[in-house]
């Protein structure tokens, strides 16, 4: 759903209809410890706990208004309406995408991408991060190639971001250069050929031959990735794969897509959870390194 800039605050506050508050922690004898915990104010018990560690009295958790300020600043990168998706998992995560007019064709008119800014605002004491990624229609991958110059910006967490909107907007506008760099890289990757079998060997290595489970997991993963590539070649109008040769762009997306959509995740992982997990996946990082340095 496309959202006008004037409606962003309502969308964010509806999605995050709670605040994270800092409360003092007590010892078993009810004596103060000098430490504090972070809790959602809409839940009780262990469900309310945010994060896995305590904080000091000096720590100030960010607010929903800070998240709104970040999203509003991000939306300024794109002209017109945006599409916003929100997620909370020990922190606020928001993706901001423009309308379909921003799509860029990579191969024909079926394999195309458009920009997506992913905002990460955790409660771990680290700076907020904004990353310019891409959404690929063909496989529904939302990927972030952080090794590409200009695609990541950090925002220092201060007591209030609202008075610093001009600085925020300037910071997010730098991601436009990152998008230009990213599209140039992607267009180059589409022109480069790689042997998919050798590429996957470089990413995953060989299984432990004396471990039947390791061999089975490896074989199933490779088969799933080859199936993913064959399907994507068919739906994008590419010719059938011969001699294991594909573009470096296809090879990277095959690894990233497997991590995002096919690999096993614990619990009831949402689409946003799976995207975040894939962005941290060591094999995806290795695949990115290989296609960018070859």
PLM region descriptions:
Residues 1-26, 30, 86-88, 101-294:
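Intrinsically disordered, low-complexity regions enriched in serine/threonine
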Residues 35-36, 46, 91-93, 127:
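A generic structural signal for beta-strand entry/edge sites
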Residues 76-102:
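A short acidic/basic microdomain associated with nuclease active sites
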Residues 1-69:
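Feature for intrinsically disordered/low-complexity regulatory segments and propeptides
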Residues 33-34, 50-54, 79, 151, ...:
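A near-ubiquitous, low-amplitude feature marking generic local secondary-structure context
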Residues 38, 96-98, 119:
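Generic structural hydrophobic/aromatic packing signal, biased to beta-strands
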Residues 66-79:
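Hydrophobic, Leu/Ile/Phe/Ala-enriched alpha-helical segments that form helix-helix packing faces
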Residues 65, 90-92, 113:
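Residues at beta-strand starts and edge strands
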């Amino acid at each position: 759903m496309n959202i006008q800039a004037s409606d962003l605050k309502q969308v964010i506050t509806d999605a995050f209809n709670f605040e994270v508050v800092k409360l003092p922690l007590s010892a078993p004898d009810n004596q103060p410890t000098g430490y504090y915990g972070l809790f959602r104010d809409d839940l009780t018990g262990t469900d309310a706990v945010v994060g896995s560690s305590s904080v000091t009295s000096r720590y100030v958790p960010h607010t929903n208004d800070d998240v709104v300020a970040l999203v509003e600043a991000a939306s300024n990168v794109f002209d017109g309406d945006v599409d916003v998706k929100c997620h909370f998992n020990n922190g606020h995560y928001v993706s901001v995408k423009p309308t379909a007019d921003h799509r860029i064709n990579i191969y024909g008119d079926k394999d195309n991408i458009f920009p997506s800014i992913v905002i990460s605002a955790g409660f771990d004491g680290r700076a907020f991060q904004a990353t310019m990624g891409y959404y690929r229609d063909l496989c529904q991958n939302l990927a972030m190639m952080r090794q590409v110059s200009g695609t990541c910006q950090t925002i220092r967490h201060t007591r209030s971001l609202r008075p610093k909107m001009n600085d925020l907007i300037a910071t997010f506008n730098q991601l436009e250069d990152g998008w230009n760099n990213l599209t140039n890289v992607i267009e180059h990757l589409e022109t480069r050929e790689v042997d998919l079998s050798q590429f996957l060997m470089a990413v995953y290595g060989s299984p432990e031959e004396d471990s039947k489970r390791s061999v089975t997991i490896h074989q199933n993963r490779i088969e799933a990735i080859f199936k993913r590539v064959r399907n994507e070649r068919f739906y994008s109008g590419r010719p059938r794969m011969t001699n294991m040769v594909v573009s470096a762009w296809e090879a990277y997306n095959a690894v990233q897509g497997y991590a995002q959509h096919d690999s096993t995740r614990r619990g009831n992982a949402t689409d946003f959870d799976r995207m975040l997990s894939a962005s941290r996946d060591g094999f995806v990082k290795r695949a990115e390194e290989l296609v960018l340095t070859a």
